[in-house]
């Protein structure tokens, strides 16, 4: 499958499951400093972001409860993470992919696309709204073309009703009646 620019990014986000079940300790900022990364801080509370001319690395955790604008400390890794809503959706169904000898876990494309349908509605910058919305629709169409309608339905049906309403609202905004009809059967 060939991806268009709507899916490309120079951001790499690492989603850390909570609770973190590891005994491994690694000072990630120190390790990446040798590769030319610098530590930058984002937001009023100082989320750590590792920046390189070609890449930005951020760490995220699923936000639970009433929410907070404070970073979530990850002392095992020498950094902190930004808590964000709806990230549980990305952890629920992952797939292992090997890229240049490195094995990574990625969210299933259906989970990723449905997540984008929810978050584009929360964005404030028009550029990010368009990018997230287009990525969601493009991925969902590709999944439909590949005959993976059941995967899209599975993700949608696994969500709480409040999240389902957000997905439906997003599809209504995009006027994607075909995709909407798949979910509301």
Regions found by a protein language model. Give the residues of each.
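Compositionally biased terminal segments of proteins
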Residues: 1-185
């Amino acid at each position: 499958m060939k991806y268009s620019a709507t899916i490309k990014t120079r951001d790499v986000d690492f989603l850390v499951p909570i609770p973190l079940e590891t005994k491994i300790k690694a000072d990630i900022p120190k390790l990446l400093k040798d590769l030319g990364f610098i530590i930058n801080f984002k937001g009023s509370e100082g989320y750590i972001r590792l920046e390189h001319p070609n890449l930005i690395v951020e760490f995220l955790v699923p936000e639970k409860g009433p929410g907070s604008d404070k970073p979530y400390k990850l002392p095992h890794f020498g950094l902190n993470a930004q808590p964000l809503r709806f990230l549980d959706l990305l952890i629920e169904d992952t797939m292992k992919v090997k890229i240049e000898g490195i094995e990574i876990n990625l969210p299933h494309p259906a989970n990723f696309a449905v997540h984008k349908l929810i978050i584009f509605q929360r964005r404030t910058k028009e550029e990010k709204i368009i990018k997230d919305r287009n990525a969601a629709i493009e991925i969902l169409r590709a999944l439909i073309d590949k005959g993976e309608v059941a995967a899209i339905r599975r993700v949608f049906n696994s969500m709480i009703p409040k999240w389902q309403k957000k997905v439906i609202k997003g599809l209504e905004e995009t006027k994607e009646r075909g995709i909407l009809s798949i979910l509301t059967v």
